[in-house]
Amino acid sequence: MRLSTMLELAVERDPRAIAIVDGDRRWSYADWYARVEQLARALRASGVGPGDRVVLCLRNREETAALHLACQRVDAITTPLNFRLASGEIAYCIGDAAPRLVVYEDCTAQAVLAGRAQWGCRPELVAVDAPVPPGGIAFDALLARGDSAPSLPPIPADADDRLIGLILYTSGTTGRPKGVPRSQRAEYAAAVAHALQNRY
């Protein structure tokens, strides 16, 4: 099973229940599912597909969670980076991941953009509540790409959950950070274990 399937099941169970709260912003499961689906269509319209990496230089916020589920929906690979990393560390990880998109916010903009010359790749830049550089777009503009994009097919019951859904970079204590892949199945199991442990 996949995390994105869990969201679909939550919508079926109680669509009006609150799914996520970020400051003064709230979404019901039904509303958030629609937003994640729109974002998944937007990713597909942006050329993001199976196996593509999407680097997130974001704090814990709604956009982070929505992007993670949207990436899984199109079989792309979420690659979150610690927002406290220095510019050189971020540049190395982006160069190593070779992502299709790099998503950042105001608190990470300087560190992300300062190392662009070192990346060795040219991902599209997506700014969340941050200045948009030449050639980049705002998150809301990315989301709007999903408005007219075709609907995605339902996730088949036998969808391969062994696909890589996440790459986490190690701290690099013995050298350069290394990208550690995690399958969609492992992410689902971790979410279930977390829910059981914390009695959600």
Residue ranges and their predicted role:
Residues P15, V132, D147-Y169, R176, ...:
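Conserved pre-ATP/AMP-binding loop-to-beta segment of ANL
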Residues V54, C71, V102, I164, ...:
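Conserved S/T- and glycine-rich ATP-binding loop of Class I adenylate-forming
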Residues T64-Q72, T78, E187:
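Short hydrophobic alpha-helical segments of the AMP-binding
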